[in-house]
């Protein structure tokens, strides 16, 4: 398995106070997405993992939409730090 370069972000921010924050959850989902993506590069026919990846992507997308509506500055900072694209809001 490939070592995840973003695991340090979670360890740095892991306090009992902010585990439920939207930013922490997005970082956690991003780590899981990257880990599953590297797994699926090796195992292309693992359809259960593909389904799990789609579910996590949807959860992260909903959290990012919530965060962009509530606090646009924190949203921009987070997507810049995680190097993910800005979501299209309907």
Swiss-Prot record:
GO biological process terms held by the UniProt record: translation
Ribosomal protein listed as a keyword: yes
InterPro entries for this protein: Ribosomal_uS15 (IPR000589), Ribosomal_uS15_bac-type (IPR005290), uS15_NS1_RNA-bd_sf (IPR009068)
Keywords: Chloroplast, Plastid, Ribonucleoprotein, Ribosomal protein
GO cellular component terms, A-Z: chloroplast; ribonucleoprotein complex; ribosome
Cellular localization per UniProt: Plastid, Chloroplast
Gene Ontology MF: a single term: structural constituent of ribosome
NCBIfam families: S15_bact
Quaternary structure and partners: Part of the 30S ribosomal subunit.
PANTHER family the UniProt entry points to: RIBOSOMAL PROTEIN S15, BACTERIAL AND ORGANELLAR, SMALL RIBOSOMAL SUBUNIT PROTEIN US15M
Family of this protein: Belongs to the universal ribosomal protein uS15 family.
Name of the featured protein: Small ribosomal subunit protein uS15c
Organism of this sequence: Panax ginseng
